[in-house]
């Protein structure tokens, strides 16, 4: 039984050495084949194929930094309109009704799911109240008065 394991072990070692030798030959062979391949390329030209010609680069100038950021446009775009700064301390008046504050969104139970219910009709004018929201440049939260 021990002789069987020794024979098996020797076969594995011999196979490994053959494998390493073949790899070494392949690596050395590829090195020499590259030199021969260069000689063949010089002798045979382009192997019967016509080489692919790349198209010439566009004749337009290279893009500027601004064109890279914004992208090139065939027509010149007008400059963007100036933005107005918000007025600090501006008062905004919002009119709401009390029943809108109490509404809760509930998912539909059945039937059409794409139907959105309209808000309830407003109550008479005397029950409405005004909310005034003031804002400032400070980091304090917005204040609301009823």
From Swiss-Prot:
Induction: By wounding and methyl jasmonate in leaves. Glycans are attached at residues 51, 55-58, 63, 79-80, 82, 119-122. The modification 4-hydroxyproline is found at residues 51, 55-58, 63, 79-80, 82, 119-122. It comes from the Eukaryota. Residues 25-48, 67-70, 86-110, 131-146 form a propeptide. GO terms for biological process: defense response. It is found in: Secreted. This is Hydroxyproline-rich systemin. It comes from Solanum lycopersicum.
């Amino acid at each position: 039984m021990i002789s069987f394991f020794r024979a098996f072990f020797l076969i594995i070692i011999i196979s490994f050495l053959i494998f390493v030798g073949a790899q070494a030959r392949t690596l050395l062979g590829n090195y020499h084949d590259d030199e021969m391949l260069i000689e063949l390329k010089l002798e045979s030209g382009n192997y019967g194929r016509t080489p692919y010609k790349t198209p010439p680069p566009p004749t337009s100038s290279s893009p500027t930094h601004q064109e890279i950021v914004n992208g090139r446009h065939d027509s010149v775009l007008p400059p963007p309109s100036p933005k107005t700064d918000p007025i600090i301390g501006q008062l905004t008046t919002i009119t709401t009704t009390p029943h809108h504050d109490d509404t809760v969104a509930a998912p539909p139970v059945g039937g059409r799911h794409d139907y959105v219910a309209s808000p309830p009709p407003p109550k008479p004018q005397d029950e409405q109240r005004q909310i005034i929201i003031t804002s400032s440049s400070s980091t304090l939260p917005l204040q609301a008065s009823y």
